[in-house]
């Protein structure tokens, strides 16, 4: 384990010479908030196979305990997204209190309108009005759960789509989608938001009813100010410029939040920042550049850890987001603007690469020291016996015990 704290004074001096307010950077890093997903602590994976992991959380109570442990190590993961019905309980207020007693809180509520056999042909867009109403009722129920646990975000992703030309009417499906979203939107708790997620394909392969940011944006505009777009970084076609999408939605006031993960080919749900760390940095650069327009953006992990240790994968994800944010905060924006306005293409690019290539580990170590969390959270995790203890106590979960299908 390398101690990076002795290198902090030199880095702080270097950043100050670039015109960076180091104290302000540290303040911003201490305010960072990354929400972890309950399903990321249980056994989850691909459509081909879910491999069980010793100690993986089997229920919402164990998921909350694991999330609290990740927050204890990182200091920046104070909330947990839940998925209904995977995390359903008989007493939501008691669950809220349980989370608070562990030092975390319930975050976004995610409806599940894709798993039941009734949703084979879609949920809100299903040709059957009975199934449409079933999906709406479930989403309204999730709004009631939000009120009970104090959540302010309903995170909506639909698997709806078609596999063959002529299977259904595109325009009729669009009308059903709008009707279902409006019905759900009308039941949102006061002060809350609906974040509309998109995905360009899978599980449907010919058409998807919410395939891209433009469709999600159009639906949000139809619904009202409480509706915004959720960007899942793995839900795009190869080569899509996600930072540009982020910038547009920020400027329009319609970027609601993120589901962070990494992808190599499709919706791979790999650890965020592992496949393309520069893209993650570029996304955070747009967020920092947007200033107050990014104040209410929600940052959430959405990953299925299939072959990785659940806790270590989650901690790795949170720390990668922290590192990307730190690099974005040390961009010399004054020099960048001068180069951009002067048409100096490569000088502008070098401003970004200089920040990206800066070794920010001493800065992060100093911030963590001031937050009273381990200066090297991963080393602390590896040295701790928490994962070994829960593996002994929980054993290996039986198929589907944690809620995730498979």
Where are each of the predicted segments found?
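Active-site groove signature of glycoside hydrolases
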Residues: 142-168, 192-197
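Histidine-acidic metal/acid-base catalytic patches
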Residues: 1-40, 50-51, 68, 152, ...
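Surface-exposed, active-site-proximal loop segments in enzymatic domains
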Residues: 48, 115-133, 158-171, 309
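An active-site-proximal structural segment forming one wall of the substrate-binding cleft
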Residues: 127-153, 173-188
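Active-site-proximal loop/turn and secondary-structure-junction residues that shape catalytic pockets
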Residues: 40-42, 84-88, 110-115, 158-162, ...
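Short, acidic/polar
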Residues: 53-70, 136-144, 239-248
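Long, hydrophobic/aromatic-enriched structural stretches that serve as scaffold segments
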Residues: 99-121, 142
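Catalytic domains of carbohydrate-active enzymes, especially glycoside hydrolases
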Residues: 26-40, 52-86, 102
């Amino acid at each position: 384990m390398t101690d990076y704290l002795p290198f902090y004074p030199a880095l702080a001096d270097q950043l100050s010479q670039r015109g960076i307010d180091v104290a302000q950077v540290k303040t911003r890093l201490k305010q960072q908030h990354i929400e972890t997903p309950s399903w990321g602590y249980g056994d989850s994976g691909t459509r081909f196979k879910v491999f069980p992991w010793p100690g993986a959380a089997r229920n919402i109570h164990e998921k909350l305990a694991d999330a609290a442990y990740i927050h204890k190590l990182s200091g920046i993961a104070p909330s947990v997204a839940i998925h209904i019905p995977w995390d359903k309980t008989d007493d939501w207020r008691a669950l809220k209190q349980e989370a608070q007693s562990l030092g975390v809180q319930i975050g976004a509520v995610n409806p599940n309108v894709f798993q039941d056999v009734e949703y084979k042909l879609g949920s809100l867009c299903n040709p059957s009005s009975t199934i449409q109403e079933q999906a709406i009722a479930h989403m309204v129920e999730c709004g009631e759960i939000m009120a009970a646990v104090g959540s302010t975000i309903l995170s909506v992703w639909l698997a709806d789509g078609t596999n063959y030309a002529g299977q259904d009417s595109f325009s009729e499906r669009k009308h059903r989608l709008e009707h279902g979203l409006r019905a759900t939107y009308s039941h949102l708790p006061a002060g809350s938001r609906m974040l509309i997620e998109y995905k360009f394909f899978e599980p449907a392969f010919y058409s998807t009813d919410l395939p891209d940011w433009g469709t999600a944006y159009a639906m949000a505009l139809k619904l009202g100010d409480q509706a915004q777009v959720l960007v899942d970084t793995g839900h795009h076609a190869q080569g899509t410029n996600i930072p540009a999408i982020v910038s547009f939605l920020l400027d329009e006031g319609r970027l609601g939040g993120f589901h962070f993960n990494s992808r190599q080919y499709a919706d791979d749900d790999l650890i965020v920042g592992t496949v393309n760390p520069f893209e993650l940095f570029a996304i955070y650069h747009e967020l920092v550049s947007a200033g107050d327009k990014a104040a209410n953006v929600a940052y959430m992990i959405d990953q299925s850890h299939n072959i990785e240790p659940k806790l270590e994968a989650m901690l790795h994800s949170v720390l990668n987001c922290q590192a990307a944010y730190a690099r974005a905060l040390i961009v010399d924006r004054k020099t960048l603007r001068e180069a951009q306005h002067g048409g100096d293409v490569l000088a502008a690019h070098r401003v970004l690469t200089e920040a990206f290539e800066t070794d920010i580990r001493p800065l992060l170590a100093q911030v963590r020291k001031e937050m009273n969390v381990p200066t090297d959270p991963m080393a602390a995790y590896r040295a701790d016996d928490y994962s070994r203890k829960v593996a002994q106590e929980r054993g290996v979960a039986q198929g589907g015990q944690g809620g995730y299908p498979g």
